[in-house]
Regions:
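Hydrophobic anchor residue at the start of the ABC signature
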Residues: 121
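Catalytic Walker B motif of ABC-type/P-loop ATPase nucleotide-binding domains
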Residues: 132-136
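Conserved structural motif at the start of ABC-family nucleotide-binding domains
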Residues: 5, 20-22
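Helix N-cap at the start of a conserved alpha-helix in ABC-type nucleotide-binding domains
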Residues: 143-145
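Helix-to-loop junction immediately C-terminal to a conserved catalytic motif
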Residues: 51
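The feature captures the beta-strand-to-loop junction immediately N-terminal to the Walker
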Residues: 36-38
Length: 189
């Protein structure tokens, strides 16, 4: 079966510093994959390269499905309301109008970190991508929002999608079908 996303010899350098050693990985339909490692191990860099937000210094990423990405630091327009952010990103990405969600009508910059994370995740789900790349997706969510996210991710998996999420949380890691571990920019066997 063709993977939904595959990295072949993907690496990333900043000048002379290698932050991600060449690595290979595949995300297949129906998979929930945890990406773990200490702070600074390269998890965010790897997810950014897989999503196409950063170009790899070497290797290539093959995507046979649409990809949604929720970075650890969301790129939101603070002066826009959450609804305006959703509509803007939907237009930029060529998706139909974003679903009407129960969102506050105040500028995003005035919202809590948890509320901004909810918006960040809503942006990742725009267009119903088959692959989701989520960087510490539950870090700022309250327990009720965490439970809703895990329910939604289970539906993505059941529909034949793939999810790769970075986490430091042992309980979340246990939800995964498999775990990828990074240490000092190297994907461990």
């Amino acid at each position: 079966m063709t993977p939904l996303l595959a990295a072949r010899g993907v690496s990333r350098r900043y000048g002379d510093r290698e932050v991600l050693a060449p690595c290979d990985l595949e995300l297949r339909a129906g998979e929930l994959v945890a990406l773990v490692g200490p702070n600074g191990s390269g998890k965010s860099t790897l997810l950014s390269v897989l999503a196409g937000a950063l170009d790899p210094s070497g290797g290539q990423v093959e995507r046979s499905a649409t990809v949604g990405w929720a970075p650890q630091r969301p790129a939101l327009y603070g002066r826009l309301t959450p609804r305006e952010n959703l509509r803007l990103f939907a237009r930029l990405e060529g998706h139909p109008a974003a679903a009407e969600l129960d969102l506050p009508e105040t500028p995003t910059v005035t919202h809590s970190v948890g509320m901004r994370q909810r918006l960040n995740l809503a942006l990742a789900f725009l267009g119903e991508p088959r692959v989701l790349l989520l960087d510490e997706p539950t870090a700022s969510l309250d327990p009720a929002q965490r439970a809703l996210l895990w329910e939604r991710l289970a539906r993505v998996r059941e529909a034949g999608g793939a999810v790769c999420f970075a986490t430091q949380n042992v309980e979340e890691r246990e939800r995964a079908d498999r775990t990828l571990e990074l240490l000092d920019g190297r994907l461990l066997p």
